[in-house]
């Protein structure tokens, strides 16, 4: 308590307190507009706050206005008014202290007495007078006053006006401490921005840290970004800031997942020369990794490596799994080695990520090495790690190691899951280890897992592929009994197996079950039919085709044609005709190749009954070539045109771009047939028209006076004989009528036709000498030979060869049924030249 004897002024740094004390002798205070609760029994006491002297603190809630309105006080009490020492009150008399002031405690005892504490002028001095001594103005008092003003005026011009009127000159320590006390962010920012305008302002990292913390608590990230820009400007202009605030801003933004803003601040901090700490790097990398941008995180990590920042354990734990999962295994393993060299203990997640990633990348040795090291560090493998290792080794085909890990997993107390069972079974089945696969399959069923259709299918297909019919059927029945629907591939594998084993009845049963399951069975049934056709099992193919027809299953024209050709090749003409009729009625195209192949069978046929069947089949084709054949053997009265004209009209109707090979094949077979039938003139007409249409463009070559040649290597026997006779006749006319005699004439026959042609020419004493593949003679000798009457008769009339020998050679040497082979490939020789 204070007892004022003649006091004019209450010092500013003295706090008024109200206490209910009967010892106090001070007059009572009536209610006022400042504190209406001040009434009767409250005594007016003044004491120094012990917080100032003991804790250097201040309570901002208690202060006295400059002109308090003390209602109900005596004149003496009303003279207790705050005044500055320089004030003039109506006279020239100074308003200083006139008498001593006694300081009392609550019991009324005198604590101290002396001259009153003189107030100071704003901005003129930073001390107070205690008697005649100067005493520094306490920081706690300054901070308390600043806080009082800020909390009252909050923000705006009025706040700045009040702060400008402070009786003391603040410094950055006062501002920093005030910011720590003021909890309202807007008020704190107003105080800070006022301080920035003052001449005594210096950038303070601590101030920014306090402000950023307040903005972060209020989730005002826009304000953080704005204040960060101010801080960057302060740093560039003064350069006195430390880097705590930079790092704190980036950490706040990273934890709030403000990716773009955080990275922008990170770049600006780097440009400002800020030293980024490890925690900031960690937070940024975690942000980018969580956002699915691992490569950006690695970019930050690389920039971290370039600085003096050291990786700590948390950074290793963060970056190694990310590098491993992104495929940068060498970098991840290098950091793993560094981590161990720095005596840091890797966590289980580091080991797990390396084991998993190395295994999936096929680096199984490294994966197993890390796995063994992990056990050396005392970590126990998890079920997930076992699954990853087993999966990696199984996919790599190292099934022995996979089984060892499988047993180790079960010994560790882990129960293999459904997927692991499936993987082990399928990997062993696909590698051909069906016994191991079936053993694990039975264990899977005992463990209570129902195998998936894919597991059943894998086992079924592998057993089917290995030809184990009984095991495949057992798995199929087990699958259907379990209520599972076999897949299309399973049905195809099983049907293929049954077809190869020639189990037609069982295959038909499976096909009907497949149809009942809702699958389209036409293609599968056709595939089975094709297997029988390729296997030359014509009887089984016909049986399967009848089953398909009775079950309403259709096949395509291509397979019908293949089966028809197989029947023709095996002499089953009775079965072939219905197939041909089916092909024709289903709008299937009977082309020139197919017709020619039937004609080829007719050429080789020596049985009259079969000839009738073949003629019936030729008629059933309804091909235009058959009408041509019929017209070719009729007389000119019925044709109403010469043979040559008739043949030319037929060949003009052929599309040579699409059917050139077929037309060449038809010429070869037709000439064989005509020669056998003794129709030499008709055969020569066919050859002439074929040569005119350039079906054999390189057959005849006139090399002026040097050499004339005929190449018959690509012709059938009949075509070669006709070509030789017709061409020699042309050579004779050219030499006798025009007098052009070449040096030599060659007949290029090849090894196959050489003997036949040589035998034919030897009957008329030809001058041609026989070599390996060519018959050649000088032009003058051939000229003399052409002058003989027998040669003229030979070239104009018919071929004097024995029909039985020619027929026998045609049966043996006739080309195969393939279109190009029929027309291009030379037939094989019947016997050697020595035999002839």
Curated annotation (Swiss-Prot):
The keyword Calcium is annotated on this UniProt entry: no
PPR repeats: 204-238, 242-276, 277-311, 312-346, 347-381, 382-416, 417-451, 452-486, 487-521, 528-555, 556-590, 591-625
Gene3D superfamilies from the UniProt entry: Tetratricopeptide repeat domain
InterPro entries the record matches: Pentatricopeptide_rpt, PROP1-like_PPR_dom, Smr_dom, TPR-like_helical_dom_sf
Domain Smr: 710-786
Xref: SMART domains: SMR
UniProt transit peptide range: 1-85
Family matches, as Pfam families: PPR_3, PPR_long
Keywords attached to this entry: Mitochondrion, Repeat, Transit peptide
Keyword Chaperone tagged: no
Compartments in which it is found: Mitochondrion
GO cellular component: mitochondrion
Family statement drawn from the similarity comment of this UniProt entry: Belongs to the PPR family. P subfamily.
Protein name according to UniProt: Pentatricopeptide repeat-containing protein At1g79490, mitochondrial
Organism: Arabidopsis thaliana
């Amino acid at each position: 308590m204070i007892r004022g004897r003649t006091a004019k002024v209450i010092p500013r740094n003295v706090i008024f307190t109200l206490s209910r004390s009967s010892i106090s002798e001070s007059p009572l205070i009536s209610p006022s507009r400042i504190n209406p609760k001040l009434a009767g029994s409250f005594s007016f006491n003044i004491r120094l706050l012990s917080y100032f002297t003991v804790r250097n603190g201040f309570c901002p809630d208690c202060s006295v206005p400059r002109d308090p309105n003390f209602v109900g006080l005596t004149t003496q009490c009303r003279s207790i008014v705050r005044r500055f020492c320089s004030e003039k009150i109506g006279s020239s008399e100074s308003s200083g202290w006139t008498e001593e002031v006694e300081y009392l405690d609550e019991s009324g005892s005198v604590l101290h007495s002396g001259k009153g504490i003189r107030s100071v002028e704003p901005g003129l001095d930073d001390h107070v007078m205690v008697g005649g001594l100067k005493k520094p103005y306490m920081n706690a008092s300054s901070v308390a006053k600043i806080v009082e003003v800020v909390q009252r005026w909050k923000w705006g011009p009025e706040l700045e006006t009040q702060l400008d009127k402070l009786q003391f000159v603040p410094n950055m320590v006062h501002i920093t401490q005030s910011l720590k006390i003021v909890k309202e962010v807007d008020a704190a920012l107003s105080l800070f921005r006022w301080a920035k305008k003052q001449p005594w302002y210096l950038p303070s990292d601590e101030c920014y840290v306090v402000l950023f913390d307040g903005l972060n608590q209020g989730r005002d990230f826009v304000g953080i970004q704005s204040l960060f820009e101010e801080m960057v400007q302060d740093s560039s202009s003064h350069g006195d800031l430390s880097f705590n605030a930079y790092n704190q801003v980036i950490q706040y933004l990273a934890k709030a997942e403000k990716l773009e803003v955080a990275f922008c601040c990170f770049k600006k901090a780097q440009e400002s020369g800020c030293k980024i700490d490890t925690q900031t790097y960690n937070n940024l990398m975690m942000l980018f990794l969580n956002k699915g941008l691992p490569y950006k995180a690695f970019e930050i990590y690389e920039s971290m490596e370039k600085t003096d920042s050291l990786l700590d354990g948390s950074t290793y734990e963060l970056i190694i799994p990310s590098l491993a999962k992104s495929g940068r295994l060498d970098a991840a393993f290098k950091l793993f080695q560094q981590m161990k060299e720095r005596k840091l203990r890797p966590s289980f997640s580091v080991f797990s990520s390396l084991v998993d990633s190395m295994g999936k990348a096929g680096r199984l040795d490294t994966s197993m090495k890390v796995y063994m090291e992990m056990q050396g560090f005392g970590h126990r493998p998890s079920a997930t790690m076992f699954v990853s290792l087993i999966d990696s080794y199984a996919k790599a085909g190292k099934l022995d190691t996979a089984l060892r890990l499988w047993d180790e997993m079960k010994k560790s107390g882990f129960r293999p899951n459904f997927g692991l069972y499936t993987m082990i079974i399928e990997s062993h089945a696909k590698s051909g280890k069906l016994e191991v696969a079936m053993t694990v399959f039975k264990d899977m069923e005992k463990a209570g897992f129902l195998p998936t259709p894919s597991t059943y299918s894998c086992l079924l297909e592998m057993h089917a592929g290995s030809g184990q019919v009984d095991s495949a059927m057992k798995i199929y029945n087990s699958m259907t009994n379990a209520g599972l629907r076999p897949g299309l591939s399973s049905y195809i594998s099983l049907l293929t197996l049954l077809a190869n084993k020639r189990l037609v009845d069982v295959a038909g049963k499976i096909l009907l079950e497949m149809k009942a399951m809702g699958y389209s069975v036409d293609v599968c049934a056709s595939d089975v039919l094709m297997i029988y056709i390729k296997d030359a099992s014509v009887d089984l193919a016909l049986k399967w085709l009848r089953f398909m027809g009775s079950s309403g299953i259709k096949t395509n024209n291509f397979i019908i044609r293949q089966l028809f050709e197989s029947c023709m090749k095996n002499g089953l003409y009775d079965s072939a005709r219905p197939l041909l009729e089916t092909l024709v009625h289903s709008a299937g195209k009977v082309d020139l190749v197919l017709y020619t192949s039937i004609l080829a069978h007719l050429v080789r046929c020596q049985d009259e009954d079969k000839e009738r069947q073949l003629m019936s089949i030729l008629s059933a084709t309804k091909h235009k070539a058959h009408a041509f054949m019929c017209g070719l053997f009729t007389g000119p009265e019925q044709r109403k045109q010469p043979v040559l004209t008739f043949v030319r009209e037929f060949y003009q109707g052929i599309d040579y771009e699409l059917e050139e090979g077929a037309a060449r094949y038809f010429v070869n077979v037709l000439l064989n047939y005509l020669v056998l039938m003794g129709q030499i003139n008709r055969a020569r007409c066919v050859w002439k028209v074929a040569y005119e249409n350039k079906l054999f463009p390189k057959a005849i070559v006139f090399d002026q006076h040097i050499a004339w040649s005929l190449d018959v290597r690509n012709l059938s026997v009949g075509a070669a004989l006709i070509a030789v006779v017709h061409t020699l006749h042309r050579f004779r006319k050219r030499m006798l009528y025009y007098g052009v005699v070449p040096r030599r004439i060659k007949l290029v026959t090849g090894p196959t036709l050489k003997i036949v042609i040589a035998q034919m020419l030897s009957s008329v004493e030809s001058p041609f000498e026989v070599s390996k593949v060519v018959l050649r003679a000088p032009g003058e000798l051939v000229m003399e030979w052409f002058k003989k009457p027998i040669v003229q008769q030979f070239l104009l009339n018919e071929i004097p060869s024995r029909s039985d020998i020619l027929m026998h050679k045609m049966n043996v040497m006739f080309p195969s049924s393939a279109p190009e082979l029929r027309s291009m490939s030379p037939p094989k020789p019947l016997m050697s030249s020595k035999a002839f």
